[in-house]
Amino acid sequence: MSDLLCSAKLGAMTLALLLSATSLSALASVTPDRTRLIFNESDKSISVTLRNNDPKLPYLAQSWIEDEKGNKITSPLTVLPPVQRIDSMMNGQVKVQGMPDINKLPADRESMFYFNVREIPPKSNKPNTLQIALQTRIKLFWRPKALEKVSMKSPWQHKVTLTRSGQAFTVNNPTPYYVIISNASAQKNGNPAAGFSPLVIEPKTTVPLNVKMDSVPVLTYVNDFGARMPLFFQCNGNSCQVDEEQSRKG
């Protein structure tokens, strides 16, 4: 009987570990105060508030920066302090600081990094207890001075175009900013097209839409505030432009 109970516990643990990183981060006790960070060159540094939402326990919060490929770095951006204690239902704060070689980043386009925070729970006094350190990872965009002024009325994402070839579409980003596409569907607020996965489109690049579509897709992008906004398109032949009026109305 004890073997069966042990097996059941191991199965439950395995299932929990197989949950996606996104699902786990949603359960984290220590979370940042936003879903993305914008670091303007003129700011020199930015502050991030970390909240411990656990009603009873204090946590350690470990923070760091990764480059676009997921490598942990301490330059051209670093986090201070890298580790701190945050008491129950209290806030902590970290500073993302630019280092001297930040001047080597491109001045004509955004650069993308990742801000990470891992919660470390206090050691449990209960025997045979599995503790999991959950981690939250959000995008951090470094924006050079020439690109700091952005218009919410005429967002750069409205400059995205599509090129059609049968059921295949290519997404073109002619701007110096990153474009994050979180959804592609046949209609506004529709279910994602089968097989679609979110796109991170680098500045001035073109990527294929990773699904086939019978009709012109409605894309959803993520803006600076983490809001999801629609992109409706009008096509002339195989070239499709954003319908700005309809996209603004949502």
From Swiss-Prot:
The record's similarity note reads: Belongs to the periplasmic pilus chaperone family.
Tell me the protein's name.
Probable fimbrial chaperone YfcS
Q: Sorted alphabetically, which keywords does the UniProt record give?
A: Chaperone, Fimbrium biogenesis, Immunoglobulin domain, Periplasm, Signal
Record carries keyword Chaperone: yes
Q: What function does the entry list?
A: Part of the yfcOPQRSUV fimbrial operon. Could contribute to adhesion to various surfaces in specific environmental niches. Increases adhesion to eukaryotic T24 bladder epithelial cells in the absence of fim genes.
> What's an example GO BP annotation here?
chaperone-mediated protein folding
Q: Which domain of life is it from?
A: Bacteria
Task: Explain the consequences of disrupting this gene.
Answer: Deletion of the operon under classical laboratory conditions does not result in any major effect on E.coli capacity to form biofilms compared with the wild-type strain.
Q: What induces it?
A: Expression is negatively regulated by H-NS and subjected to cAMP receptor protein (CRP)-mediated catabolite repression.
Q: Which PROSITE patterns is this protein grouped with? A: PILI_CHAPERONE
Q: Name one GO molecular function term.
A: protein folding chaperone
In the UniProt entry for this protein, what further remark is given in the free-text comments?
Answer: The operon is cryptic under classical laboratory conditions, but is functional when constitutively expressed.
Which organism encodes this protein? Escherichia coli (strain K12)
Against InterPro entries, the record matches this protein to: Ig-like_fold (IPR013783), PapD-like_sf (IPR008962), Periplasmic_pilus_chap (IPR050643), Pili_assmbl_chap_C_dom_sf (IPR036316), Pili_assmbl_chaperone_bac (IPR001829), Pili_assmbl_chaperone_C (IPR016148), Pili_assmbl_chaperone_CS (IPR018046), Pili_assmbl_chaperone_N (IPR016147)
Q: Signal sequence: where?
A: 1-28
**S-S pairs:** none
Q: Gene3D superfamilies of this UniProt entry?
A: Immunoglobulins
Q: Which GO terms describe its cellular component?
A: outer membrane-bounded periplasmic space
Principal subcellular localization = periplasm
Q: Where in the cell is it found?
A: Periplasm
